[in-house]
Structures are given as structure tokens and as C-alpha cells.
């Protein structure tokens, strides 16, 4: 199977499909008025360590808003990697959970989704840059695009 393009029903394994999905996520972010944010996609064989984290950056961070007391700004890359850390530890969507306390280096922000496109692989997709609901919607766009034939 080609690492760049994938083949047949397994197109999502290819870098081209993953890059196309990341582009669709950034396009959706821009369409809803976001000009900052970071998207990621991880596709891995079940039971194996992650071998590739694909990501793309619309804008890495937001400066502090001096009109809001206490606003220190936001590093979207840092936030999205914290979401990914939790997702890699649990293989569940990035959501608050009463079942598992957060560890240092994790956040309970929504915006990351996990799914199994076949019996052998698991996919993690996430975005940080909007509200939690916007981040989830953008991640779902990435999932749809990733699974679409080239």
C-alpha cells in the first residue's frame, strides 16, 4: 500500500488524504470566521505506537486581549497537543470525564474525535482555535474528508 496515497478502502492511511482532510478543516475554520488555530490527524494501527502526527497551523497563537482583565492569550498548538495527549491515553474523544481524572499535561476541552475506520486502525482528529463546539464541528469535517475517496 502506498504511504503517500493509500489504496482502495484504505485511502485514509495515505498522507495525501490526511493532508487533504487537514486543508478541509482549516477551510471550515476560515468559513466560520476563525483566523487562528491548529488541526491534527493521527492514523495508527491498533496496538502500535503512533508513527506520524500530521498537523497544520492556521495561526499558532492569540495574543492577550488587553480589554479583558486576566486574558493571557492562547497557544493553540499547545492546547491541541494537550487534547491529543488525553486522546492517546484513553483512545476516547477529548471530553470531560468523571471516569478518569485528568493527569498533568491533559485538558478536558472538547474538540478531538476518535474513531475506527476498520478493524485494524484507529484515527484521532482534533482542532483548537474556536469554541469547543466549533472545534468538534471542524474535526468532523476532517473525518468526512479523510474517509472520502481521492
Spans of model-derived segments:
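Flexible, solvent-exposed loop/hinge segments and secondary-structure transition points
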Residues: 1-150
